[in-house]
Regions:
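Acidic active-site catalytic centers that drive phospho-/nucleotidyl reactions
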Residues: 8-10, 49, 103, 122
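General small-molecule cofactor/ligand-binding pocket signal
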Residues: 41, 80-81, 135
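Short, well-structured N-terminal submotif of metal-dependent ribonuclease cores
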Residues: 1-42, 57-65, 144-147, 152-174
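Alpha-helix C-capping/helix-to-loop hinge sites
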Residues: 15, 33-37, 53-57, 74-78, ...
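Active-site-proximal, substrate-binding regions of enzyme catalytic domains
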Residues: 28, 45, 51-78, 85
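Active-site neighborhoods of divalent-metal-dependent phosphate/nucleic-acid chemistry enzymes
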Residues: 79-121, 158-160, 168
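Acidic, metal-binding active-site segment of PIN/NYN-like and related structure-specific nucleases
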Residues: 104-146
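Short beta-strand segments at enzyme active-site cores
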Residues: 42-44, 119-120
Length: 174
């Protein structure tokens, strides 16, 4: 299983853009893999940008209804909310690295979700921000995602605890 992978807006848009015959199938291949492994991650910012661009700028664009279906499906990718933690982390990144505010928000969202990889075309391919690697999905083949981006599948927590005393409570012995 690959570690969580943050997907920037442009990758989602390329997957819908029939006017990009080279990039569209590559973006689709990445998204298919991330859906299969349940390792895709995004942010509220990405969802907003996707909705606006796929309905207003992409030619031919999607209807608002179809675009919203995509957004709702992507809720399962655990969108990072725009909250105080995200803004604070983005500001730290903006001060430390030569990043725009919007790129700082993307990197911060990926870091807060503990992603190993950020797929984007907007940042330098191969850039490193702490433990986060930036790669272009058009230079890194899905099949080349090896050891640096792999994690052991976490064991699922039990759905319910056994009935009885709350976890961690024990009767005191005298």
């Amino acid at each position: 299983m690959i570690a969580p992978v943050f997907v920037d807006t442009n990758i989602l848009l390329y997957a819908r853009d029939a006017g990009e015959p080279i990039k569209q199938p590559l973006a689709e291949q990445w998204l298919r893999r991330l859906w299969q492994e349940r390792s895709g991650r995004i942010s509220a910012q990405v969802l907003s940008e996707y909705y606006v661009n796929v309905t207003r700028k992409l030619v031919p664009g999607l209807s608002a209804e179809r675009a919203w279906e995509d957004v709702e499906a992507l809720y399962s990718w655990v969108p990072q909310a725009t909250d105080c933690a995200l803004l604070t982390r983005a500001r730290e990144l903006e001060r430390r690295y030569p990043l725009s505010w919007w790129d700082s928000l993307i990197v911060a969202a990926a870091q807060l979700q503990q992603c190993a990889l950020l797929l984007t075309e907007d940042l330098q391919d191969g850039a490193q921000y702490g433990e986060l690697s930036v790669r272009s999905p058009f230079t890194l083949a899905v099949s080349d995602v090896g050891a640096p981006y792999r994690v052991e599948r976490e064991q699922a927590a039990p759905r319910h605890r056994e009935r009885g005393r709350p976890i961690g409570s024990r009767p005191k012995r005298s």
